[in-house]
From Swiss-Prot:
Belongs to the GPN-loop GTPase family. InterPro entries: Gpn, Gpn3, P-loop_NTPase. This is GPN-loop GTPase 3. GTP binds at G13, S14, G15, K16, S17, T18, S173, K174, M175, D176. It comes from Mycosarcoma maydis. A motif (Gly-Pro-Asn (GPN)-loop) lies at residues 70-72. CDD domains: GPN3. GO terms for biological process: mitotic sister chromatid cohesion; protein import into nucleus. PANTHER family: GPN-LOOP GTPASE 3, XPA-BINDING PROTEIN 1-RELATED. GO terms for molecular function: GTP binding; GTPase activity. The keyword Ligase does not apply.
Length: 281
């Protein structure tokens, strides 16, 4: 077996930690060795105790206090410190061979979209530690009630995909709230066809709303950005309900396919048979 890692990223509040817990529970029910890697130096509560925790190396609270930095600057410092202390990472990862690592990332999307820090870490995990990596990017389903926010979320997902350069799955999270009618009332009324316009971004859906809420001088820019999304067809979403085991199982199967899980497993030796097994009845 190889080494596999799932990078769980997305904005704060998108349900990353909940998804990590659901993914771990489902994978363990399948008999897999799964471990949580907390990559958020500010995280405090976990449903599953992390097997690897960046806070054992450095914490955001300490950095902000000692270096007089704000939250974002402190977070970048923490990641730079991690990359400068790969011996710690080597010791932590060395105890997990042939295992599935779930990496719970911070919610500051600049790490995936604007800075090379996360892409450097992903490259190290892939090239130096030989992990097969699939990145997931969670966008909260409440964004479908505000097409401008949804439009920005699609662009952020695309930026993360381009920067990380690994197999990538975008997830529209908290779909249980859509089913309950708490959010996404317009999509709910339009049934499945309307929802599909959000899962596979429809340029007309984006243009109509965005242009109606922005200064006319930005309309050509909006058109260019929407055309970019449509031309490359890079961004699509899978629905995720972390409370539904079938939904989590479907996502895991797509992750498995992306990292080619189990494809390098050596075939098992056939069971030895006694001569009596071939005796005619």
């Amino acid at each position: 077996m190889g080494r596999y890692a799932v990078l769980v990223s997305g904005p704060a509040g998108s349900g990353k930690s909940t998804f990590c817990s659901a993914l771990i529970a489902h994978a363990q029910s399948l008999g897999r060795n799964v471990h949580l890697f907390n990559l958020d130096p500010a995280a405090e509560r976990f449903e599953y105790q992390p097997s690897i925790d960046i806070k054992e190396l450095i914490s955001l609270e300490d950095v902000m206090e000692e270096m007089n930095l704000g939250p974002n600057g402190g977070l970048i410092y923490c990641f730079e410190y991690l990359l400068d202390n790969l011996d710690w990472l080597d010791d932590e990862l060395g105890q997990f061979n042939d295992d599935y690592i779930i990496i719970d990332c911070p919610g500051q999307i600049e790490l995936y979209t604007h800075f090379p820090i996360m892409s450097r870490l992903v490259n190290i995990l892939s090239s130096q530690y030989h992990f097969r990596i699939c990145a997931t990017y969670l966008l909260e389903s409440q964004f479908i009630d505000d097409k401008t926010k949804y439009f920005a979320g699609v662009l952020s997902a695309m930026s993360a995909m381009i920067n990380l350069e690994v197999p990538h799955i975008n997830l529209l999270s908290k779909m249980d709230l859509v089913e309950k009618g708490e959010i996404g009332s317009e999509a709910k009324r339009g049934r499945k066809r309307e929802m599909e316009r959000y899962l596979d971004p429809d340029p007309l859906l984006l243009m109509d709303e965005v242009n109606s809420r922005t200064n006319p001088k930005f309309h050509s820019l909006n058109q260019a950005l929407v055309q970019l999304i449509d031309d490359f067809s890079m961004v699509s979403f899978m629905p995720l309900d972390s409370t539904d085991e079938d939904s989590v199982g479907t996502i895991l199967s797509h992750i498995d396919n992306a990292v080619q899980y189990g494809e390098d497993e050596e075939p098992k030796e056939p069971k030895d048979m006694d001569e009596g097994d071939f005796t005619a009845q």
